[in-house]
Amino acid sequence: MQKATYYDSSAIYGAYPYQGANGFTYNASQQQYPPSSSLVETEYHRPACSLQSPGSAVSHHKANDISESCMRTLPSQPLQPPGLTDPQAPPQPPPAPQAQPPPPSSASPSQNASSNPAPANSTKSPALNSPTVSKQIFPWMKESRQNTKQKNSSSSSGESCAGDKSPPGQTSSKRARTAYTSAQLVELEKEFHFNRYLCRPRRVEMANLLNLTERQIKIWFQNRRMKYKKDQKGKGMMTSSGGQSPSRSPVPPAAGGYLNSMHSLVNSVPYEPQSPPPFNKPHQNTYGIPASYTAPLNNCPPPQKRYTGTAAVTPEYDTHPLQGNGYGNPHIQGSPVYVGGNYVETMTNSGPSIFGLTHLSHPPSANMDYSGAGPMGNNHHHGPCDPHPTYTDLTAHHPSQGRIQEAPKLTHL
């Protein structure tokens, strides 16, 4: 069936400009293409991609914008309509030496009118619309036309075949969801309780027992392991967040003795829980030693707090009641430091930097979280009550008293 009766004279026969009655003129420097006498105004050769009647001027512009394949083979044409960028259209064969005679005028207006409301199809197969062109072009267009028909028919038939085959094939497809019975689920859960990973003989045995395939059992165990891992992760987060709050889990009494033996401090005194717990903030890195203990301060003034050391060197300081040799970095906020068995949360307000002997007094509101359970001696607080304030650390060896000779090296923070 012929879809259209016009072909692009400016595309294939670019040397012959024409002027239509609707006001569209292709201006070229060569002689004008002589129109056929039988076709007066409606039978000028239109572009192959434009299927419009002569009266549709706006759609004719759109067809000129769409059909790049009509203009692609003429790089030396003087005037091309702008915006012809269709990269998907194949190039035309070389132009014929003379124009083909147009079809009879009786069939062309009706076919033109029938093909008028379909300009979108012209972008897919621009050369399908001209059945009356030279033999160099016609087989290619016929082939492409048949190819599109074959593609459409094959895709529809493929869909129908896939639709026919998919219901029986869903049992073996990956996307199929296997419905397990309650008895099968009980057996699978029981097996998972004892063995999270099945060996192949046991898997074959269970497949025969439960009337399932090995693949189904393997995939069920994979999914069940992932679910188990997710559940364990959720439980671990819940217990860790709940167990680290100081009000929930008290420290067992053996923890004090263990830390005492680990520290081997000289003048250790028994601890008692303080009545007002200082800065009892639940932190997630306190490693399950959440209850706070303080040493008896022996009637010392409250601003003079004890500070614990962090490194392997533990010098003892001279009597300087509020000497600012703090072992807490004031710039690292909220990260607890493991110091001498105690988990001390570093200060969040301004203070002297690490090991800076700046002689600045620590403010009494420094957020020191004494959440460790290790006992410390009564000589481990400085102030006017004790002439030599001692700074304890993890290794707990005490060098001779005197002023500090060098700044201790910070090994882990």
From Swiss-Prot:
Disulfides per UniProt? none
Transmembrane keyword on record: no
Record-annotated DNA-binding residue ranges: 173-232
Cite the residue spans of the region called Disordered. Answer: 72-131, 143-177, 230-252, 374-413
Q: Where is the composition biased (Pro residues)?
A: 88-106
> For this UniProt entry, what is the primary localization, expressed as one broad class?
nucleus
GO cellular component terms given for this protein? nucleus
**Which InterPro entries does the record cross-reference, listed alphabetically?**
DUF4074, HD, HD_metazoa, Homeobox_Antennapedia_CS, Homeobox_CS, Homeodomain-like_sf
Subcellular location as annotated: Nucleus
Name the PROSITE patterns on file.
ANTENNAPEDIA, HOMEOBOX_1, HOMEOBOX_2
Gene Ontology biological process: anterior/posterior pattern specification; embryonic skeletal system morphogenesis; regulation of transcription by RNA polymerase II
Q: Where is the composition biased (Low complexity)?
A: 107-122
For this chain, the family text in UniProt reads: Belongs to the Antp homeobox family.
Name listed for the protein in its UniProt record? Homeobox protein Hox-A3
Species name = Gallus gallus
Gene transcribed to yield this protein: HOXA3
